[in-house]
Regions:
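Active-site proximal helix-loop segment of RNase H-like, two-metal nucleases, encompassing DDE(D)
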Residues: 139-151
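A domain-level signal for caspase-like cysteine endopeptidase catalytic cores
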Residues: 1-85, 115
Length: 197
């Protein structure tokens, strides 16, 4: 989990805490290991991809159609480090074990997900427009709760959208799921129960 809010205007720590709580209360929590990197820099991205080798890369922070904003190695609020969508995709690709899913929990990031699934990962999720911070947090917590309970990628995505709808929010359709042609989100389950030995 990469979180970046160089200007301090997003509740990245709250999102990471909610995701951790959702996973820790799930059925298959023992099969999930979280690598949480608040104030994430581009070094954290590359280090996490190559060392931790995650099945899922989660980014929460600022973005738009063409870029993602990481933090700089500064202790004061700053404008961040701009990373192009292409450079981000190249970073995700720069490993022998690329992740299965990238979730960009940031504004207007859905424009980047088609290229990710065309070139890098089987599944990607992004936001179709600007999304309120609380809505993004609620979507992510519900999505990961469903994943950790053994639901398919598609069902987890739908559960996250329904969470927003049940909360009476207008942004339920903002989270967008894309997938490569050779995979099926309705049958892909990222967390399965282990067979007792």
């Amino acid at each position: 989990m990469l979180g970046a809010s160089s200007e301090g205007d997003l509740r990245v720590g709250r999102e990471q805490k909610r995701i951790r709580a959702a996973v820790e209360s799930a059925l298959h929590r023992d099969q999930i290991e979280l690598d949480v990197r608040p104030a994430a820099t581009t070094h954290d991205l590359l280090d996490g991809i190559t060392k931790f080798r995650p099945h899922v890369v989660h980014f929460s922070g600022h973005s738009n159609e063409d870029l993602i904003v990481f933090e700089d190695e500064q202790d004061a609020p700053h404008s961040g480090v701009i990373v192009t969508a292409r450079a981000f995709a190249n970073a995700i690709r720069a490993t022998d074990d690329p992740p299965l899913l990238v979730l960009l929990n940031s504004c207007k990031s859905a424009a980047q997900i088609d290229d990710l699934v065309d070139q890098v990962v089987p599944f990607a999720i992004g936001m179709a427009d600007s999304i309120d911070d609380a809505d993004a947090i609620n979507y992510a917590a519900q999505f990961y709760a469903a994943i950790a309970n053994g639901q398919s990628v598609n069902s987890a995505h739908l559960a996250g959208q329904v969470r927003l709808e049940l909360d009476g929010l207008d942004s339920a359709d903002l989270p967008t799921l894309a997938w490569a042609p050779d995979v099926d989100p309705t049958t892909t389950i990222l967390v399965r129960p282990t067979d007792p030995a």
